Amino acid sequence: MSLFHSNTAFTASTLDIEAEDIQYFLSLMYGAIVVTLLIFQRLFSFFRVRTYILLTCSLSILILLGISLTRDPFLIGILRVIEGIFCVLEGACFLPLLMMQIKHTKSRTIAYFFLYTFMLTGSTLTTSLLKESIMDYGWQDMIHVVLYWHLIVIAIALLLLNNNRLGKKFPLYQLDLASCLFLLISLSCGAYVLIYGRKYYWFECSTITINFALFLIFGSLFIIKQRMVKRPLFHFEILRYQNVIFGVILFFLFYIIRSCLNNVYTVMATVWKWPWHYIVDVQYINVLGTILGVGSSGFLLLRDVSPKYIFGFGFLILGTSCFLFVPTFYPDTTIWAIGLPLFIQGIGQGWLFTPLVIYILTGVESHHAGNAGLMGTTVRFWGTNVGFALIQNASYTLNQKHYIQLEQTLNTNNPLTINYWNTLMEKYTGIYGDQIAGRIASKSISGTLSQQASLISNMEIFTYLGILGMLITGLIFLFGSAKTLFMRLRMPYL
């Protein structure tokens, strides 16, 4: 049910605010999730299960009520941080509960497959559930719908769960809350730099410079404090494990490639002018692919297939989907044309996500598993924000470049240009007069050029991402051979 917290897309469309603002609100929440995972196990062990769920759900309802009653962006930002804390407290407890119910030698792996299937498909599912409320009523009513779902969770907890503990009770003392605060400030400031950097011309703006400095200062304070305390929240020793390093790198690259999917939905809305409720339905093509990908990689993982083949084929599928998107970026595309790459992209992300997590977790000693999982969550935080920043900057730069190129090709001696201009003038002259009609016609041509520039830019972006996917695939399959060759060449000098 914590997945219902994350959907702010329709709030953005109703309030007409910038994409950067929505991304930053999500990043505030996700940064709070990363920080709370440091102390989640202590909090979960302190309470009995039913009491814990009732408490977190009740507080989540109060937070949602607060969000529905305010329009102050600063206050909403604070509430999003608090919401992120209770989001993970509410959601993360279901993983150990699920593991206990699965009678299998690999219950943890199966439980993770369930969890990440919901995480990858949750935004589309929750969007569909909230669609009717936002269409017929408003964004406050949308939040109330989320609130009602939490009431259902409370009813389930009261009726079906007992009040036993899953393990030994740990008292809530010696919690290193100062380190949590340092990390939260560092993540929030770092996310601000990545998300708003292009908008404010990076370090030409004092706000960006200050946030970058705060990111470095509080990040350093967190690291220093963790090195000094006897019982650190995060053990940096896990960075010595090969699985963690490789898994983190692959996870980061996975999120860079995956971040381009938002561009597809943006083109659907701004260029092809598809209704947003129709775009929601189209996303189910991607959901079906994701479920198929999760099931396929899960079958291979339970059969102990080498991670090299799972990762290699996963990035091959992602790269192929990027190449298949390229020819769909035309003004007259159809759902049948865009459906295939959407489906294949879903297979790729579903195929890779859980195996990457399991690869990181199984590569460390059992007492470091929690920190390894936190590394994966942190990489998702940075991967999402870096991917957003990269795609935003690439889209902006390429759009400007292609717009200028297209504008330069307009020639008043070209019959096509003359006919198009005359058609627009005839359309608007009878309504507005010659002078206003000329302005509207110029604006219409500018809008058409912007749309064409956007389509060409996306062709270029997806081509580069497809090449990246293929390069990663090649490196995965060749890494073992290259490492062996390197060691052989190095042996005479050792």
Name each model feature, range by range.
Residues 141-159, 179-188, 208-215, 405-416, ...:
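Symmetry-related core transmembrane helices of the 12-TM Major Facilitator Superfamily/SLC fold
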Residues 1-9, 26, 233-399:
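12-transmembrane solute porter fold
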Residues 26-42, 88-95, 284-297:
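Central cavity-lining transmembrane alpha-helices of secondary-active solute carriers
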Residues 159-171, 192-279:
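Membrane-helix boundary/linker segments in multi-pass transporters
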Residues 39-41, 45-178:
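Helix-loop-helix hairpins in multi-pass membrane proteins, especially solute transporters
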Residues 1-31, 35-37, 90-91, 261-265:
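Extracytoplasmic
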